[in-house]
């Protein structure tokens, strides 16, 4: 397998949650990391969290719904080795009969179309032999709760995106990581005061008997970057949640 020592890795969504966990793990393996997020405040906090990286971290603010900002991002980043995208905001959660068209449109624009645009502009400066790794989620693999139609549809689309792009962009490798529930700021925002009870119930049902942290999910992204013979695949890192 390849090594990340001396490689440049761009992490879209790297200012918090899974993306920040991937950034920390990537730095531990000797890479240079570029974290990208929408919020300058979160980026500054992430830089402080990663402050032991001896200047190997840079941060860029960019909105993934704005193609001009994505294009400028990769112009500024210039040549790099690996792309990781964990970006995406809170999904719509209303039942279909109460779904608001504009809320759905914004989520699709942010999560799916944003991924397309990131791939479009990243490939201009991605080095030969590099990789792209996107993020889907558990909703595509198990019966979703009522109100989960939109997020399930988008999560499912990423497997097909990776398969198509792995052929179109070869030899660039394109893969997807599909996590289950992860203890992140986004989950806390969605669950509110119910988070603790939800986590306790789910952990008791999972074969892994615990809820993942970003550090539990990060090794899958490392594998996707380092494994030179893995492309077009979806890696299910869910503690067995897709089985229950």
Protein language model regions, located:
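Conserved glycine-rich cofactor-binding loop
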Residues: 15-17
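Conserved mid-core segment of classical short-chain dehydrogenase/reductases
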Residues: 88-105
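Catalytic loop of short-chain dehydrogenase/reductase
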Residues: 107-108, 117, 131-170, 181-182
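Active-site-adjacent segment of SDR/Rossmann-fold oxidoreductases
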Residues: 125, 164-173, 228
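Short, flexible catalytic-loop segment of classical short-chain dehydrogenase/reductase
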Residues: 179-189
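Catalytic Tyr-x(3-8)-Lys segment
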Residues: 195-216
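C-terminal substrate-recognition "lid" of short-chain dehydrogenase/reductases
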Residues: 210-237, 242
